[in-house]
A protein has these predicted regions:
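Substrate-binding/active-site clefts of carbohydrate-active enzymes
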Residues: 1-108, 131, 137, 153-154, ...
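Active-site-proximal helices and loops of the catalytic beta/alpha 8
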Residues: 10, 24, 33-39, 57, ...
Length: 199
């Protein structure tokens, strides 16, 4: 159904950008469900940042894991200094190929046109550099925008993202044009905020 939407959007001259969440998943994600069921014996046990496995000899469930911003419903994928473990890396690369060139014929015209990457600053630069190489090899015109909450200069060197969501600018604009309370910026305060952003 989604690929039909992409096809119809393309017929109308529209581009489709999807939200890619590679830092964490939900508790209903198939690999995480397998980890819950099979604990250390799960073939996906190394995919997640598990802090403690359940001890079946006790009545309580000791299974704990790292959740994104401590949100238990959003288990984080385990990532070391060099990025995700290979099976996770491969999984993300495969889903990237799936949505960018759905039929795998080397022609990406039936796939999506871009990615908005959630919590991008929480994933290693090593991963993003490799991922961008894959993305641009499939379709050099793919638009890649990362969610970076603060200074994004490290991600904008031409080897990771094409753009970022500019939260500092957005916050300043909202405070100047929209806020009506004590957070509202005067014109000179707004100018100073923009100068800080420009560096």
């Amino acid at each position: 159904l989604f690929l039909k939407l992409v096809r119809e959007a393309h017929k109308r001259g529209m581009k489709v950008i999807i939200d890619g969440v590679f830092n964490h998943c939900g508790t209903r994600f198939w690999a995480f469900r397998d980890v819950i069921r099979n604990q250390q014996q799960s073939r996906y046990a190394g995919w997640f940042d598990v802090k403690r496995w359940d001890d079946p000899s006790t009545s309580q469930n000791e299974f704990t894991y790292k959740g994104w911003w401590d949100v238990r419903d959003l288990p984080e994928f385990w990532e070391g200094d060099s990025g995700f473990v290979k099976p996770v890396w491969d999984y993300f690369f495969n889903i990237t190929r799936r949505w960018m060139d759905p039929n795998g014929d080397g022609n990406p015209s039936d796939g999506i046109d871009g990615w908005r990457l959630d919590a991008a600053n929480e994933i290693s630069h090593v991963f993003w550099k490799g991922w961008r190489s894959l993305v641009k090899s499939i379709n050099p015109n793919t638009y890649v925008v990362g969610e970076i909450r603060d200074d994004a200069s490290k991600w904008l060197k031409g080897d990771e993202f094409d753009a970022v969501m500019n939260y500092p600018y957005a916050r300043a604009v909202v405070r100047f044009f929209i806020d009506t309370d004590s957070r509202r910026l005067t014109a000179s305060e707004f100018d100073r905020e923009l100068a800080k952003i420009r560096g």
